[in-house]
Amino acid sequence: ELIALAKEKNVNFLFEASVGGGIPIIRPLNSCLTADVIEEITGILNGTTNYMLTKMSVEGSEFADVLKDAQDKGYAEKDPTADVEGFDACRKIAILTSLVCGQQVDFNDIHTEGITKISATDIKYAKAMGKAIKLLATSRKVGESYCAMVSPCMLPQEHPLYPVNDVFNAIFVHGNVLGDAMFYGSGAGKLPTASAVVADMVEIAKFKDTNLPMEWRPEKLELADYKMVTNRFFVRTKADEAAVKNAFGAVEFVAAEGVNGELGFVTEEMTEAAYEEKAAKLADILQMIRVK
Protein backbone atom coordinates (compact mmCIF):
# COMPACT_ATOMS: atom_id res chain seq x y z
CA GLU A 1 0.00 0.00 0.00
CA LEU A 2 2.76 2.46 0.95
CA ILE A 3 4.85 1.51 -2.09
CA ALA A 4 1.85 2.13 -4.37
CA LEU A 5 1.14 5.47 -2.68
CA ALA A 6 4.78 6.54 -3.08
CA LYS A 7 4.65 5.66 -6.78
CA GLU A 8 1.41 7.62 -7.20
CA LYS A 9 2.98 10.70 -5.55
CA ASN A 10 6.29 10.26 -7.43
CA VAL A 11 8.24 9.92 -4.18
CA ASN A 12 10.08 7.00 -2.57
CA PHE A 13 9.30 4.69 0.30
CA LEU A 14 12.47 2.88 1.42
CA PHE A 15 12.85 0.41 4.29
CA GLU A 16 16.37 -1.03 4.27
CA ALA A 17 16.50 -1.28 8.08
CA SER A 18 13.38 -3.47 8.24
CA VAL A 19 15.41 -6.64 7.63
CA GLY A 20 18.91 -7.30 8.91
CA GLY A 21 19.45 -3.99 10.70
CA GLY A 22 22.61 -2.53 9.18
CA ILE A 23 23.06 -5.29 6.59
CA PRO A 24 22.26 -4.12 3.04
CA ILE A 25 19.79 -6.66 1.65
CA ILE A 26 16.63 -4.83 0.50
CA ARG A 27 18.49 -2.69 -2.05
CA PRO A 28 20.58 -5.57 -3.44
CA LEU A 29 17.48 -7.71 -3.96
CA ASN A 30 15.60 -4.81 -5.55
CA SER A 31 18.37 -3.64 -7.88
CA CYS A 32 21.67 -5.55 -7.93
CA LEU A 33 20.13 -9.02 -8.29
CA THR A 34 17.23 -8.27 -10.63
CA ALA A 35 18.91 -10.26 -13.43
CA ASP A 36 18.49 -13.40 -11.33
CA VAL A 37 15.61 -15.60 -10.42
CA ILE A 38 16.17 -15.91 -6.67
CA GLU A 39 15.74 -19.60 -5.93
CA GLU A 40 16.47 -19.53 -2.20
CA ILE A 41 16.85 -17.12 0.69
CA THR A 42 17.89 -18.57 4.04
CA GLY A 43 18.77 -16.29 6.91
CA ILE A 44 19.48 -15.82 10.57
CA LEU A 45 17.24 -12.77 10.83
CA ASN A 46 16.83 -12.29 14.58
CA GLY A 47 19.80 -11.29 16.71
CA THR A 48 18.09 -12.01 20.03
CA THR A 49 17.46 -15.68 19.34
CA ASN A 50 20.87 -16.12 17.73
CA TYR A 51 22.50 -14.68 20.86
CA MET A 52 20.46 -17.02 23.05
CA LEU A 53 21.26 -20.14 21.01
CA THR A 54 24.95 -19.20 20.95
CA LYS A 55 24.99 -18.81 24.73
CA MET A 56 23.16 -22.13 25.20
CA SER A 57 25.79 -23.79 23.01
CA VAL A 58 28.81 -22.22 24.72
CA GLU A 59 27.61 -22.55 28.32
CA GLY A 60 25.23 -25.50 28.16
CA SER A 61 22.54 -23.29 29.70
CA GLU A 62 18.79 -23.83 29.56
CA PHE A 63 16.40 -21.59 27.62
CA ALA A 64 14.97 -19.76 30.66
CA ASP A 65 18.44 -18.82 31.90
CA VAL A 66 19.67 -17.39 28.59
CA LEU A 67 16.39 -15.52 28.09
CA LYS A 68 16.88 -13.74 31.42
CA ASP A 69 20.48 -12.94 30.46
CA ALA A 70 19.34 -11.54 27.08
CA GLN A 71 16.73 -9.39 28.83
CA ASP A 72 19.28 -8.15 31.39
CA LYS A 73 21.60 -7.13 28.54
CA GLY A 74 18.80 -5.39 26.64
CA TYR A 75 18.84 -7.84 23.71
CA ALA A 76 15.36 -9.20 24.51
CA GLU A 77 12.22 -7.22 25.30
CA LYS A 78 10.32 -7.60 28.56
CA ASP A 79 7.77 -9.47 26.44
CA PRO A 80 10.09 -11.52 24.16
CA THR A 81 7.30 -13.36 22.32
CA ALA A 82 7.94 -11.86 18.88
CA ASP A 83 11.59 -12.91 19.03
CA VAL A 84 11.53 -16.31 20.74
CA GLU A 85 8.41 -17.59 18.96
CA GLY A 86 9.90 -16.72 15.56
CA PHE A 87 7.34 -14.04 14.63
CA ASP A 88 9.97 -11.35 14.00
CA ALA A 89 11.95 -13.62 11.65
CA CYS A 90 8.68 -14.64 9.98
CA ARG A 91 7.76 -11.04 9.13
CA LYS A 92 11.25 -10.42 7.77
CA ILE A 93 11.27 -13.45 5.47
CA ALA A 94 7.80 -12.36 4.28
CA ILE A 95 9.30 -8.99 3.26
CA LEU A 96 12.22 -10.61 1.42
CA THR A 97 9.96 -13.13 -0.34
CA SER A 98 7.60 -10.35 -1.42
CA LEU A 99 10.53 -8.47 -2.94
CA VAL A 100 11.88 -11.39 -4.95
CA CYS A 101 8.49 -12.62 -6.21
CA GLY A 102 6.95 -9.18 -6.74
CA GLN A 103 3.72 -10.04 -4.92
CA GLN A 104 2.34 -9.68 -1.41
CA VAL A 105 3.31 -12.49 0.97
CA ASP A 106 1.17 -12.70 4.10
CA PHE A 107 3.34 -13.60 7.08
CA ASN A 108 0.32 -15.35 8.61
CA ASP A 109 0.65 -17.98 5.87
CA ILE A 110 4.24 -18.87 6.82
CA HIS A 111 4.73 -21.93 9.03
CA THR A 112 6.62 -20.61 12.06
CA GLU A 113 8.29 -22.31 15.00
CA GLY A 114 10.38 -20.55 17.64
CA ILE A 115 13.13 -21.63 20.02
CA THR A 116 11.16 -21.94 23.27
CA LYS A 117 11.32 -25.75 23.16
CA ILE A 118 15.08 -25.94 22.54
CA SER A 119 16.86 -27.40 25.57
CA ALA A 120 20.41 -28.00 26.78
CA THR A 121 19.87 -31.66 25.86
CA ASP A 122 19.19 -30.70 22.24
CA ILE A 123 22.44 -28.72 22.22
CA LYS A 124 24.34 -31.79 23.48
CA TYR A 125 22.99 -33.88 20.61
CA ALA A 126 23.84 -31.16 18.08
CA LYS A 127 27.42 -31.00 19.36
CA ALA A 128 27.70 -34.79 19.21
CA MET A 129 26.81 -34.55 15.51
CA GLY A 130 29.20 -31.64 14.89
CA LYS A 131 26.30 -29.29 14.22
CA ALA A 132 24.89 -26.02 15.57
CA ILE A 133 21.23 -25.15 16.17
CA LYS A 134 20.11 -21.90 14.49
CA LEU A 135 16.71 -20.30 14.02
CA LEU A 136 16.42 -20.14 10.23
CA ALA A 137 13.97 -18.23 8.07
CA THR A 138 13.86 -19.84 4.64
CA SER A 139 12.12 -19.14 1.36
CA ARG A 140 12.56 -21.46 -1.64
CA LYS A 141 11.16 -21.23 -5.14
CA VAL A 142 8.76 -24.09 -5.83
CA GLY A 143 7.38 -24.05 -9.36
CA GLU A 144 5.74 -20.66 -9.90
CA SER A 145 5.48 -19.94 -6.18
CA TYR A 146 7.65 -19.96 -3.06
CA CYS A 147 7.60 -22.02 0.11
CA ALA A 148 8.56 -20.16 3.29
CA MET A 149 9.21 -21.42 6.81
CA VAL A 150 10.78 -20.36 10.11
CA SER A 151 12.12 -23.04 12.43
CA PRO A 152 15.16 -24.17 14.42
CA CYS A 153 17.55 -26.26 12.31
CA MET A 154 20.76 -28.18 12.89
CA LEU A 155 23.48 -26.90 10.55
CA PRO A 156 26.70 -28.75 9.63
CA GLN A 157 30.05 -27.00 10.02
CA GLU A 158 30.41 -26.55 6.24
CA HIS A 159 27.17 -24.53 5.99
CA PRO A 160 27.92 -20.80 5.49
CA LEU A 161 25.54 -19.86 8.34
CA TYR A 162 27.16 -22.24 10.87
CA PRO A 163 29.73 -19.72 12.25
CA VAL A 164 27.23 -16.84 12.59
CA ASN A 165 27.01 -16.29 16.35
CA ASP A 166 25.79 -13.89 19.03
CA VAL A 167 23.64 -10.95 17.85
CA PHE A 168 24.93 -11.07 14.27
CA ASN A 169 22.62 -11.74 11.33
CA ALA A 170 23.39 -13.33 7.98
CA ILE A 171 21.37 -13.88 4.83
CA PHE A 172 22.28 -16.56 2.29
CA VAL A 173 20.94 -15.98 -1.23
CA HIS A 174 21.02 -18.34 -4.21
CA GLY A 175 20.24 -17.00 -7.67
CA ASN A 176 19.99 -18.94 -10.92
CA VAL A 177 22.74 -16.79 -12.48
CA LEU A 178 24.69 -15.48 -9.49
CA GLY A 179 24.89 -18.76 -7.62
CA ASP A 180 25.56 -18.31 -3.91
CA ALA A 181 26.05 -15.04 -2.03
CA MET A 182 25.90 -14.14 1.64
CA PHE A 183 25.24 -10.86 3.45
CA TYR A 184 26.59 -10.68 7.02
CA GLY A 185 26.75 -8.06 9.74
CA SER A 186 25.13 -6.45 12.74
CA GLY A 187 21.43 -7.25 12.61
CA ALA A 188 20.40 -4.94 15.42
CA GLY A 189 21.57 -2.07 17.58
CA LYS A 190 21.05 1.66 17.28
CA LEU A 191 24.13 2.49 15.17
CA PRO A 192 23.85 -0.32 12.56
CA THR A 193 20.13 0.38 12.19
CA ALA A 194 20.75 4.12 11.99
CA SER A 195 23.28 3.47 9.22
CA ALA A 196 20.57 1.82 7.11
CA VAL A 197 17.99 4.53 7.90
CA VAL A 198 20.35 7.39 7.02
CA ALA A 199 21.38 5.61 3.80
CA ASP A 200 17.69 5.52 2.81
CA MET A 201 17.36 9.23 3.62
CA VAL A 202 20.38 10.01 1.41
CA GLU A 203 18.90 7.89 -1.39
CA ILE A 204 15.59 9.74 -1.12
CA ALA A 205 17.38 13.10 -1.24
CA LYS A 206 19.39 12.05 -4.32
CA PHE A 207 16.24 11.01 -6.18
CA LYS A 208 13.92 13.69 -4.84
CA ASP A 209 11.73 13.97 -7.93
CA THR A 210 12.06 10.40 -9.17
CA ASN A 211 10.25 7.28 -8.08
CA LEU A 212 12.70 4.39 -7.81
CA PRO A 213 10.98 1.28 -9.19
CA MET A 214 10.16 -1.47 -6.72
CA GLU A 215 8.37 -4.55 -7.98
CA TRP A 216 5.95 -5.40 -5.16
CA ARG A 217 2.39 -5.69 -6.39
CA PRO A 218 -0.60 -5.90 -4.00
CA GLU A 219 -1.77 -9.25 -5.42
CA LYS A 220 -1.33 -11.96 -2.81
CA LEU A 221 1.04 -14.85 -3.51
CA GLU A 222 -0.33 -18.24 -2.54
CA LEU A 223 2.62 -19.96 -0.90
CA ALA A 224 3.44 -23.57 -1.70
CA ASP A 225 2.60 -26.09 1.03
CA TYR A 226 5.58 -26.46 3.37
CA LYS A 227 4.55 -30.07 4.04
CA MET A 228 5.80 -30.98 0.56
CA VAL A 229 9.34 -29.74 1.34
CA THR A 230 11.92 -32.43 2.13
CA ASN A 231 14.24 -32.48 5.13
CA ARG A 232 15.99 -34.86 7.43
CA PHE A 233 14.69 -34.81 10.99
CA PHE A 234 16.45 -35.25 14.32
CA VAL A 235 14.11 -36.86 16.85
CA ARG A 236 14.36 -37.56 20.58
CA THR A 237 12.08 -40.22 22.01
CA LYS A 238 11.45 -42.41 25.05
CA ALA A 239 10.59 -45.32 22.74
CA ASP A 240 12.97 -48.24 22.11
CA GLU A 241 14.98 -48.99 18.96
CA ALA A 242 12.48 -51.54 17.67
CA ALA A 243 9.63 -49.03 17.87
CA VAL A 244 11.75 -46.38 16.14
CA LYS A 245 12.65 -48.70 13.25
CA ASN A 246 9.05 -49.87 12.96
CA ALA A 247 7.87 -46.26 12.56
CA PHE A 248 10.72 -44.73 10.53
CA GLY A 249 12.62 -47.61 8.94
CA ALA A 250 16.35 -46.96 8.49
CA VAL A 251 17.61 -44.23 10.83
CA GLU A 252 20.94 -43.07 12.24
CA PHE A 253 21.05 -43.30 16.03
CA VAL A 254 22.96 -40.59 17.89
CA ALA A 255 24.49 -40.76 21.38
CA ALA A 256 25.13 -37.63 23.42
CA GLU A 257 27.37 -37.45 26.47
CA GLY A 258 25.42 -37.25 29.71
CA VAL A 259 22.04 -38.06 28.12
CA ASN A 260 20.32 -41.22 29.36
CA GLY A 261 16.85 -42.74 29.34
CA GLU A 262 16.00 -41.74 25.77
CA LEU A 263 17.04 -42.26 22.15
CA GLY A 264 18.15 -39.70 19.58
CA PHE A 265 18.11 -40.44 15.86
CA VAL A 266 18.19 -38.80 12.43
CA THR A 267 15.77 -39.87 9.71
CA GLU A 268 16.37 -40.26 6.02
CA GLU A 269 15.29 -37.32 3.86
CA MET A 270 11.51 -37.12 3.54
CA THR A 271 8.70 -34.61 3.19
CA GLU A 272 7.19 -32.88 6.21
CA ALA A 273 3.96 -34.75 5.50
CA ALA A 274 5.76 -38.10 5.48
CA TYR A 275 7.49 -37.24 8.76
CA GLU A 276 4.19 -36.40 10.43
CA GLU A 277 2.68 -39.67 9.23
CA LYS A 278 5.60 -41.71 10.59
CA ALA A 279 5.82 -39.72 13.83
CA ALA A 280 2.18 -40.52 14.54
CA LYS A 281 3.20 -44.19 14.81
CA LEU A 282 5.84 -43.49 17.49
CA ALA A 283 4.87 -42.74 21.07
CA ASP A 284 6.75 -40.49 23.48
CA ILE A 285 8.46 -38.13 21.03
CA LEU A 286 10.28 -35.51 23.09
CA GLN A 287 11.65 -33.25 20.35
CA MET A 288 12.02 -32.80 16.60
CA ILE A 289 14.52 -30.50 14.90
CA ARG A 290 15.13 -30.29 11.17
CA VAL A 291 18.62 -31.20 9.94
CA LYS A 292 20.37 -29.51 7.02
Task: Cite the ranges covered by each PLM segment.
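Oxidoreductase and adenylate-handling cofactor-binding alpha/beta cores
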Residues: I25-I38, T49-S61, R91-V105, D200
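Catalytic, metal-anchored helix/loop core of enzyme active sites in primary metabolism
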Residues: E40-T42, N50-L53, S57, D69, ...
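Rossmann-fold NAD(P)-binding glycine/threonine-rich loop
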Residues: E1-S31
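Substrate-binding/catalytic subdomain of NAD(P)-dependent oxidoreductase enzymes
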Residues: L67-A170, G189
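A generic structural signal for well-ordered alpha-helical segments
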Residues: A6, A70, A126, K245-F248, ...
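Electropositive phosphate-/nucleotide-binding environments in soluble metabolic enzymes
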Residues: V19, I23, A35, N46, ...
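A conserved regulatory-domain signal marking ACT and ACT-like small-molecule sensing domains
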Residues: M201-K292
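General beta-strand structural signal in soluble alpha/beta enzymes
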Residues: F13-A17, E40-G43, L135
